[in-house]
Amino acid sequence: MAVAENAGVKVDSSGQNLDNNNTAASATETTKPPCPDDDQSPKSDSSTPLTIDSTPETDDRINETAQKVQTLNGFSGNGERDNNGEIKDLADAFSKLNPMAQEFVPPSLARSQSGVLRNGLGFTNNFAAPPKLADGNDHFPRRRRSFGQGKRRMNKRTSLAQKDDVIRRTVYVSDIDQQVTEENLAGVFINCGQVVDCRVCGDPNSVLRFAFIEFTNEEGARAALSMSGTVLGFYPLKVLPSKTAIAPVNPTFLPRSEDEREMCVRTVYCTNIDKRITQIDLKGFFEMLCGEVHRLRLGDYHHQTRIAFVEFAMAESAIAALHCSGIVLGALPIRVSPSKTPVRPHFPRAEFK
């Protein structure tokens, strides 16, 4: 009967024939040649997971193997990085460095290294800091410097443009007679345009003088060039385009009140004074030719020649002193012009004997 024939068959819960499977497995083992690498452990494929019975011996063996692997990889038994492994990694990294290579410094820090960076490190409050924090501020210092440089460049360009404009409005006048004052010279050029400033200067290598005249516009300066050859005093003037602007007078030296303006009328400015001339000599020279000297200020000895401010008691004496320009005092001809600044008594007035 079919029932009797199937009675000896073993069937598991999945309906597979275990006896047939065992028979097939044993037949395969007898026919398959032994592999030298085979450790006689059961093999598993992708469909059947490998299961190992957990025993105290297998657990100890697995832990021992894992510790050996971690030790070889540079980790200690508790999973932390081993010092020997770190030293080995550092030694390998340093062995790859070029000892002849130059230190790299970013361009943004090159200008700020002096006095701040030492041996590639910056120090803030006695602590080593990264180079970007060496100045104590990490808020984009490079961008801040670039803004400041741009502002300075803009201010410099603006000042240069303004200076060039002033130069184009200025003429240079030479061969000016010693008797010609700034008022006389400005009156000659008033027909060319409105005069902003007129500055007469002495030439130590000549008995003549030169001057700079600034106009309100370039048209006045161009018209002034046609005045070259005009006789003023005893000599014809030479007028050329100026290469420099008139230096402004320090406003702190200008008169601050009506009394100081009245003092300027009575004061003359003297240049090209012999260094051997003393204050007493200069005072006696002007009092003999012009009148009483109220106050006198003589410059220092640090230059080749000296300057002086002479304030007279009367305005008529100051006008007379202008005619003394060119007279030899000591070994040099003295230059006299109206003063734009008063003589302020910063210290007690010197006693003249």
Curated annotation (Swiss-Prot):
CDD domains: RRM1_CID8_like, RRM2_CID8_like. Residues 141-156 have a biased composition (Basic residues). One of its GO terms (cellular component) is nucleus. Residues 169-244, 266-341 form the RRM domain. Keywords: Nucleus, Repeat, RNA-binding. Residues 20-31 have a biased composition (Low complexity). PROSITE patterns: RRM. Its main location: nucleus. One of its GO terms (molecular function) is mRNA binding. Signal peptide: none annotated. InterPro entries: CID8-like_RRM1, CID8-like_RRM2, Nucleotide-bd_a/b_plait_sf, PAM2_motif, RBD_domain_sf, RRM_dom. Residues 1-61, 128-159 are annotated as: Disordered. Contains a PAM2-like motif, which seems to be involved in the binding to the PABC/CTC domain of PAB proteins. This is Polyadenylate-binding protein-interacting protein 10. It comes from Arabidopsis thaliana (Mouse-ear cress).
